[in-house]
Every structure is written in C-alpha cells, then in structure tokens.
Amino acid sequence: MEITFLGTSSGVPTRSRNVSSVALRLPQRAEVWLFDCGEGTQHQLLRSDVKISQITRIFVTHMHGDHIYGLTGLLASCGLAGSGQPIEIYGPPELKDYLKACAKYSHFKLPHHIRFHPIHPGILYEDAEFSVSCNLLKHRIPAYGYRIAESDRPGRFNVEKAKSLGIPPGPVYGELKQGKTVTLPDGRNIRGQDLCGERETGRKVIYCTDTVFCEGAIALSEDADVLIHEATFAHQDAQLAFDRLHSTSTMAAQVALAAQVKQLIMTHFSPRYAPGNALQLDDLLQEARAIFPNTILARDFMTYEVPRRSSD
C-alpha cells in the first residue's frame, strides 16, 4: 500500500500545492484508489508516477468544490481513452446529480463503465483483501471520512517443516498456507497454523477531511497505521476552525492520540501559512508533535509506503 499526495492545499491551489486529492496505490492488484478529486487533479496525476489507467475506485468525502471540481475532467479523459475498465465512484447522493449536470451542459457523455454508489456510514466495499467503510464527520455540509482496512494474512509457510512431516507438495500446501486443518491420506490431521509463522495483521489507512475535531473521526481512526487528517489552521486560529468547522494542527494530533494510530500525516493546509508569513507550516508541525510525536506534513507528490506489521 502506497499513498501519493496529489493535492494538499485547502480551498484554493498555491504555486506549490494543489487542492485535495490522494491516491492509494495497491501494487499487488495493479489498482489505484483515488480519494477526492479537486480541480487540477488530472494534471497532478500526469506529473506523478500514478497511472490514470489503473484508477478503479474514486471516493469523494463531500461536495465542496476543492474536492470535486477535477472529477468531471478526469472522467471525460477516461472515457476518451476508451479503456472500458469499470470505475466505481463513491460519494454523497448529490454527486451523481452533479456529474450528470456537468455532462449535460458541457455536452459529453459520462463513460458507460462508471458505476455510482451513494455513501452511508458503515461498510461500503469489501472483498477478500480489503474493506472500505466510512463515518460521518463534522463539517458545514455532510462530509465523510474513509477507513481502508487490509485483511489479515497468514504468516510465512514453512515448506521444510511440511516436508519433514511427510506432506508432499501439491494443492494441500495452498490450504495449509491459509491456516486450514487438512486430513492426509494416512489419517493425520495437520493444522495449517502450526506450519505458518506469526499472522500478519492487515494495515489500516484513514482519510479524514473536512472536519472539526469530532468523536466520529476518532472512532473511524482507531488503531490505524496511517491517519491522513486535515489541519487547515494553526492552534492560534482555533476560532476560525470552529467557525468554519475545520481542524487545527492540534485537533488532528488529538484525534491521532485518542485513536492510538501509528502515524499521523497532516494535509489540507490554509494558504495563509505560506513561507514568509508570520506563521508557517513548520509551526503547525511543531504544534502537532507536542501532542503526537509521530506526525509529518504532506506535500504534493510525496509518497508514503505503509509498512506491514505483525500481530500485536
């Protein structure tokens, strides 16, 4: 699992930061899942090493323009490319009407292989490898955070031990690797878990924006490997955060601490903290680290590989 930040600015782009979009790359299945698609995201994708052709799912948090204005252009390009690969889109119910209106008035057809899924709190998608769920956050309009959870994996299969027990290679190895108990032709029952190393706990990535500090974000983020959380304002601008229902750096850190996450990555920064101003992003970083030391700042085109972990 690799996270690539395509846009890390709040509201409007700056010279060094585009508006919101994050790509989650899943190399083992050659897929990219996109979270939000602000204006200019297509250009950011072209400047990155993320392949547009691998995008299979797009998750939208809410209907503010800095999170959706790039979606129509991206989908139009996907349609022109003619790959025919299904793209599943998850977002608020209004998103479907928005896309249809854009298509109608700009005279293009939405690609036929796009499927829309209105979101609701709970599990939105699940297969053998991953599940995606969402929870309501606290913003001026309905906004949802997403939790991507990887399934636990069996530990490494000990082939030599299996051979020493007289188990010949074959389909039975596949069952044992999954931790199943199998009965051999001689009547012996062999437990797969006895031939596998420590079970590998699945990784969890959380994407929380836009929101002020809320219990919903904490519940969604519990025991995550990575929490991507908005930090629009510095602590001294907390009143602005409460007025506009955005988070400060310290609010993001408090969510990370309460949820006991392993790594906090802050994003969605107000342009007011640009270099040369009285307060800068390094100040927000220090504020957050005073509460939650494992904090870093996202920047456009930064890639973070989510490390695997063993069972706790």
UniProtKB/Swiss-Prot annotation:
Cysteine disulfide partners in this protein: none
Residues the entry annotates as binding Zn(2+) 1: H62, H64, H139, D210
Residues where Zn(2+) 2 binds: D66, H67, D210, H268
CDD domains: RNaseZ_ZiPD-like_MBL-fold
Names of required cofactors: Zn(2+)
Enzyme class (EC, first level): hydrolase
Domain of life: Bacteria
Keywords, in A-Z order: Endonuclease, Hydrolase, Metal-binding, Nuclease, tRNA processing, Zinc
Catalysis performed (reactions): Endonucleolytic cleavage of RNA, removing extra 3' nucleotides from tRNA precursor, generating 3' termini of tRNAs. A 3'-hydroxy group is left at the tRNA terminus and a 5'-phosphoryl group is left at the trailer molecule
Family the entry assigns: Belongs to the RNase Z family.
Protein's UniProt name: Ribonuclease Z
